[in-house]
Amino acid sequence: MAARTPVIFLHVGAMKTGTSYLQQLMTDNKQVLLEQGLLFPGKQGWSDQVLAVRDILDLRLDSELRERGTGAWGRLRAEMLAYQGRASLVSMEFLSFASAEKARTVVRSLRGAEVHVILTVRDSSRVIPAQWQENTQNRGTISWPDYVEAILADSDEQSASRQVFQRALNVPRMLEAWGQAVPKERLHVILVPTPTTRPAELWERFASVIGIDPSVCAPPTRPRNASLGYASADLMRRANVQLADVGMLAYGRTMKSYLSKQVLMGREGEPAVATSRALSDFALNWNRSMSDAIAKSGAHVVGDPSDLDVAPSDASEIAPPPEEQVLDAARDAVAGLQKVIGTRTKRLESAHRDAPADVEPPPVAPAVDIERWAAAPDPLDAAVTDVAMLARHAMALRTRLRRAVGEPEGDATFDESRPSSETVGLVGKVMRRVRYL
């Protein structure tokens, strides 16, 4: 009897193309997928895939995770090659940064398996604002108008913003790199549906490629990644200026996981990030280049070409969000931070009562009077300063909690069993410091 050839799918991204939604869905339905013959590997959850990809691509950028990542790809590889089911699947956006050489290295490491590559592609007019919003949640400080200006600039010397854009949206480069690593019949492109389609459409397209009945999987327990409103994202990037010295993981657990995801994304009625005629025209041309590259690659394509259509804009320029809208976001941010500070303070007080010799009592929270903002020379600066001050205090409390009782449950929990904003937040650091691997 002939030996079985393992089948391995590599979902390589790209960034901001529904990857978090798909990863969450597959994490939540891991056992169901296993019953269908598909392994979504990782003994400790999806974070094992993050560490493994960092390992194989040699992304040694964070000292806190470096030791945990050593040998992670070898462990994940062994798990997949030993699996006796129909196929295994890895989904991790860092793979989209790979050069042709690195892509070949990844595929060669899986020698003996039939490797398929999946690339999800989304209309760039929707990706570009999402990129900037993500940037504001990863310590980014550039304003949206300046970000757009940098992307539109026709210059040989690329800005940091333009480089980030290229890494996330240079689909021709991604197809060329991975197209050299696998035969074209094993290269799959899935077009991300437009927002008007059913939420499950992306999963149904993805499931058709990996050979799964989409109806057997329940929707993710966490909602799809919501977007920050324009004012909330602007507040985040302003606060980031004052938090530039904060470590990435400390920042992610309070600013991204909690303030952004749990407080500011819950604000209703906030206007979306603005666009302009120039940006729409740029996105239209960029989408054409992606479509041409997809056709040239010979890849198996799932989706409708109209999914890459661009909604026109008549705006001649992009203006900053109105100051009052940013102040409203700051008021909600203060309320949210005061709430989490209260929760963390109570936990530290309890830990101090249980072990007064080992745990210091929590520090007193800074006082904030939002009524004074209006009387300040620069009300917005006063508001941002208060938000940053409270965020620092919340981070300090969480650091003490970790030392006292280990990883605290509840607010902004770093749950490594599923896609988490801290794990995904590493993308921001990688994209700032790595060109193409």
Positions of the model-derived regions?
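Anion-recognition interface
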Residues: 1-437
